[in-house]
Amino acid sequence: MEDVEARFAHLLLPIRDLTRNWEVDVAAQLGEYLEELDQICISFDKGKTTMNFIEAALLIQGSACVYSKKVEYLYSLVYQALDFISGKKQAKQLSSTPEDGTIGDASSRAPQEAEQKFRALDDLSDSCANVDLRDDQVVSGTLIPLLPNALVAPDEMEKNSNPLYSCQGEVLASRKDFRVNTCTPHPRGTFLLEPLGVSLMEALQPWNPKEPGRAEEQPMEVSVCGSPGPALSTSQEPGSSPEGPVPRGGGVGEDEEDAEGAAEPPEASAPEVPMEPPEPRSPEQSVAQPRRYTLRERKEAPEPASRLKDTPDPWQGLDPFDSPDSKPFRKGRPYSVPPRVEEAPGQKRKRKGAVKLQDFHQWYLAAYADHTDSRRSRRKGPSFADMEVLYWKHVKEQLETLRKMQRREAAERWLPRAEQGLWPVEEDRLEDSVEDLGAADDFLEPEEYAEPEGAEPGEDADMEAEAMPASLRYEELVQRNVELFVTASKQDVFVTTSRQELVQETELKQHIRGWEDAIQSLLQEQEEHVPFDIHTYGDQVVSRFSQLNQWCPFAKLVAGQPAFEVCRSMLASLQLANDYTVEITQQPGLEAAVDTMSLRLLTHQRARQRFQTYAAPSTVQP
């Protein structure tokens, strides 16, 4: 066994050296380090100020809480201000637009605002007989109403339960985002946040006789003449009943006179007087007042059960398997274009006849325009797709023909057409188009192709013809016009582009442009700097010391250098202090220690040189 160990001793030696290097009691060293940290006390100003990390942490936490509360309070104040502004605007809009639609002056608007500010609660049907009110009762606290469930923001799980997808598969919204799914619908069409407010809203809603929906609920009576009118009741004297005996007489003639008097409209008998709430009066005053007619209040008649059954529920779900009601067949009116107005697309292979197609405009004016003959009924205009396509197709052709005619008239003033014989084929086309346009003067609007007012046709062409010599040939004339056109187009494009740039140049873009200019200059300056090598700058700092163990201020070492060079020298000095090449010191005190850094050179040997010549214990020969 000893021979085997001696044989492989050179292989076991590196492993033993490696295990010897790792035989370190980490737990003991960590315990000693924690004990030293527990005994260390950080103080400033020669022990006057002691650093307590627990108090500092609590102070930072409290400051963060205070500032967060301030931010939340400011957030709520902003929302309150927005609600106040929106409510003020709504109040102004309501006060400026009365019910009758007329806009009054400021003097008449003030009492309306005062009336609309508070709602009268005298028309509530609840009895208040058993309620005792105490003046000296102390209010225990302010009751905050709960937020309705419809206004509570849903969580992420509720939002993702039934999402609404688009055609491309994107999530557009959730089911809770629509009020129709979170609120309770009222029969009048209002969405209520809670169903508890239905009866209260009906009780608070005033009765308006002008409302069209309540017209049929007003009690009506039929007079003798057969015309319906509102039910009237007479104010009787005290002690007399409305169902008392009929007064004297009672003949047929008197009844007819009473019927004629009742049939007269109220406007003819007495002027209109605005209704006012009755005031409490004494019996003597009521006896002295003459008898007057007033509207008698009647209870609303309940709707018959048959009408309630016939009215469908708009919110009731439909049965997908229910057979729909059969609707009667309605015969439609066919529309067709005459065969001689447009060529049929399916007759290419057939032999065409010698029949000439009828002009579309002549047929259209004869069929749909106004007729002088009143005995012939006027047809309706084009109302189907094929007719619309054909109509606008011919309109575009006519407009294009008119533009060609105007250009030709302008060119005829300085181009002799008869001598040079230009455009022989187009002449025939224009002549045919002019003949067709003769019957369609009222078919096209002249404003679409007319020249601006104050400018005679061909005025620009006359000026150009006067400036041109008579010896120019047609080719030279065309080249000159093309060059002028290209030059003018370039100028127009340049002017348009510059205008668009000026319009789009906003204040934000100006700030961005200034920031880009500043950043570009800084980046260019950074690119010109020499690459940073901490060892090179460390050698420069060491070379500035004249001898060992001599204190030298850092400001003296970096005097006259730019800011980025000072920063690099500072980093190199810290690295030298970490390698125990130099020693750093400063004056005591917080404020007094500013800019008092001094260095002392300990050795000329570099730490990187020691690492370069370092050899592991295992590699060293014993």
Curated annotation (Swiss-Prot):
It comes from the Eukaryota. Residues 262-273 have a biased composition (Low complexity). Residues 294-312 have a biased composition (Basic and acidic residues). One of its GO terms (cellular component) is nucleus. One of its GO terms (biological process) is positive regulation of chromosome separation. Component of the condensin-2 complex, which contains the SMC2 and SMC4 heterodimer, and three non SMC subunits, NCAPG2, NCAPH2 and NCAPD3 that probably regulate the complex. Regulatory subunit of the condensin-2 complex, a complex that seems to provide chromosomes with an additional level of organization and rigidity and in establishing mitotic chromosome architecture. May promote the resolution of double-strand DNA catenanes (intertwines) between sister chromatids. Condensin-mediated compaction likely increases tension in catenated sister chromatids, providing directionality for type II topoisomerase-mediated strand exchanges toward chromatid decatenation. Required for decatenation of chromatin bridges at anaphase. This is Condensin-2 complex subunit H2.
